[in-house]
Amino acid sequence: MVKLRLKRCGRKQRAVYRILAIDVRYRREGRDLSKVGFYDPITNQTFLNLSAILDFLKKGAQPTRTAHDISKKAGIFTE
């Protein structure tokens, strides 16, 4: 199963996150299938590749709660 989840990057006390499509069998820092976004909680910047995210969601990928919330704020899940 593929999930959309966050991977921690950056330095101590200055975390930034990449939003990845990754197989659930791999750990958080493991091998990813694709990088689909970026999130910086300190400056509140978000970059999302909408076409890649929608493509993975159509194929059955499940976002984690945090990845879902970030995507929802960006307007992906407008229903």
Curated annotation (Swiss-Prot):
Please tell me where this protein is predominantly located: plastid
Q: What induces it?
A: Transcribed and spliced in green leaves.
| Entry keywords, A to Z | Chloroplast, Plastid, Ribonucleoprotein, Ribosomal protein
**A GO term for molecular function:** structural constituent of ribosome
Q: Do the record's keywords include DNA repair?
A: no
Q: Domain of life here?
A: Eukaryota
Q: Which GO terms describe its biological process?
A: translation
Example of a GO cellular component annotation carried by this entry: ribosome
> Where found?
Plastid, Chloroplast
Q: Which family does the record assign?
A: Belongs to the bacterial ribosomal protein bS16 family.
Fill in the misc note: The nucleus encodes 2 genes for bS16c that can be imported into chloroplasts in vitro (At4g34620, AC O65686 and At5g56940, AC Q9LTS6).
This chain's protein is named Small ribosomal subunit protein bS16cz
